[in-house]
Amino acid sequence: MSILGIKLFKGESALVTGAASNIGRAIAVRLAGEGADVTITDIDKNRLSEVADEISNISQPPRSIVSDLSNTSGWKNVWNFVADAPPDIFVHSACPQRHEKDLPLSVEEGTFDAMINTNLRSGFFLGREVANAMRNRNVEGRLLYLTSLHATEPRNLPHYSASKAGMTMMVKEFARELGPSGIRVNGIAPGAIPGGGFATSEDSFRPKRKIPMGRFGNADDIARSAMALLSNDFMGYVTGTTLIVDGGLQLFNWIDFPEQ
């Protein structure tokens, strides 16, 4: 399961939020395959159990906790669960489902709050607890946040775009603060990944027109990129950046094809 035939994270521990989602799952499985002792969390109990089984087939069984990061008690419960053995690696992939109907003038307050709380608030406060523990243990830890192209380009998902924009700046703020302690903080902005947070069909998206590489990405494209960013051997001097993994999608503006 290791990409290079070596265990990039042997002897290290990792915490992955949103681990039952498409991308979160791929990252958690890759981390386990690279030798990390993984803790996984998600709001979906059944899918989280499936991920735990998948990881158990390739490495030691993960620790897992069901959590709802849209409220304060959720991230606190996760932290209390791992505080006795804090992770060396933190990946924040949790994100509520988003819908195309959540337009600026129609998105409901509860939906807006759940998005901001899960992506931004929980990402900040849980990440801060993890980072403080890393610094106290003199660990050259890594924090990785799953952001989005919509952090900089609007797409009628105001709560989602705003939360991801906040996460992108949070990466930079954390990186400035934690760099002197040897802790690296980065983000990944995925492109069009079917099976992610909202449905995308090839017929409606026309990837060959909008994606220079001519195909959708997949969860493992993101997971492999995450392994590179998290590896101190390969990316040990990279911090405060957001890596765009989109096959070139950002090279097109959404108005390039106004009929869509």
Q: Locations of the language-model features?
A:
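Conserved glycine-rich cofactor-binding loop
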Residues: A20-S21
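A short, exposed helix-loop element centered on a Lys and neighboring polar residues
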Residues: G127-R128, K172
